[in-house]
Amino acid sequence: YQDQHFLALSDLLVAEEQGGIKGHGDNPEIMMGGFYMAYGLERTASDIFERLLDSNRPQKTRDAAWLYLAKMRYLRGDLAATHEALEHISETPVGAAVEELESLKVNLFIKENRLEEARAIVEKVSLREDRAPYLYFNMAGAYARNQNYEQAVAFYNRITQMRQRSEAHLSLYDKAMTAAGFAHLYNQQNDLAVQQFKQVRLDGPYSNRALLGFGWAQVEGENYQAALTPWQALSKRTLIDENTQEAMVAIPYAYEQMDLKPAALQKY
C-alpha cells in the first residue's frame, strides 16, 4: 500500500529463506508472483502462479492465479489465451480479485472493439473508486479511435467530476483534457476544443501538447493572431519535444495566412 514494491519483494524472499510467512495462506506466494510480473520477470511469475493452480489449493487462490495468468497473456497480446484463463475463474471471486477481473475484462473488450460490453462494466463503477478515472480514460480513447467523439468527450469529462488531487490523478486529468480538446478539434468543434485545452495546467506533463492543440483550434476558426500566443510560448520550450518542433513550423504558417509574408519567411 506504500508502493515500496522492491522492499516488499525483498522481505518476502528473506522470509521464504527463513521458513516462510505463517498464518497468511497462499497470499505471500500470490504477492511474490505479482511483484515478479510487475518487474517483467514473466517466466518466474508464471511458474509461481501455475504452482498455485493445484486442485488442493483453495478456490480463491486458484482464482487469483488464473487472474494473473490472464493478465500476463493479455499483456503479451494473446487474447484467445486470455479468455481461456478467465474461463477458469469461479463465478464468485472474492476481495480485490473482483475489481481486477472487471478491469481486465474492460480492457479486453476494448481491445476487441466490444465497446458496449466494456461500457456495461464501467457504468457500474463508482466515481469514488481509484480505478474509475483510468477506466473512463480507456473508454474515451476507445470511442475516439472509433471516431465517436461525442462519447469520447463525455467519458473524458467524467474525470473532471472527481475530487482526487494526487499528482497521478492531476496528470491523468491533464491528459484527458488534452485528448478531449483534440476530440472536439477532430469533430470541428473549435470553440469547445479551446475550452478543453484551457483546463490543462501550463506546468504539467501535457502542457506542450495542449498549447499546440490550442493553436490549431484557433487556426481552424481562422483566428491566426490568437494561435500565435500559445505557439510562441511553446516555441521557447525544449526543442527536443515534437510539439515544440511543430509549433515552430506552425508559427510562419500562421503569419502566411495573415498575409505577413516577410515575417513568415523570417520565421521559416
Model-derived features: positions:
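Acidic, polar-rich low-complexity tracts and alpha-helical solenoid repeat scaffolds
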Residues: 1-268
